[in-house]
From Swiss-Prot:
Named cofactor requirement(s): Ca(2+)
Primary subcellular site in the record, as a coarse category: secreted
Pfam families: Phospholip_A2_1
A GO biological-process term: lipid catabolic process
Name of this protein: Phospholipase A2 neuwieditoxin-2
Superkingdom, natural source: Eukaryota
Length: 40
């Protein structure tokens, strides 16, 4: 579930998943546009 995925991110990175990773990656976020953050 999404809850379990968020819990895994928190446990592995020690960061809250949504403020740090909510709009992460290529073309993520509202409207599906934006610049890639890194090679991930």
């Amino acid at each position: 579930s999404l809850f379990e995925f968020a819990k895994m991110i928190l446990e592995e990175t020690k960061r809250l998943p949504f403020p740090y990773y909510g709009a992460y990656g290529c073309y993520c976020g509202w409207g599906g546009q934006g610049q890639p953050k890194d090679a991930t």
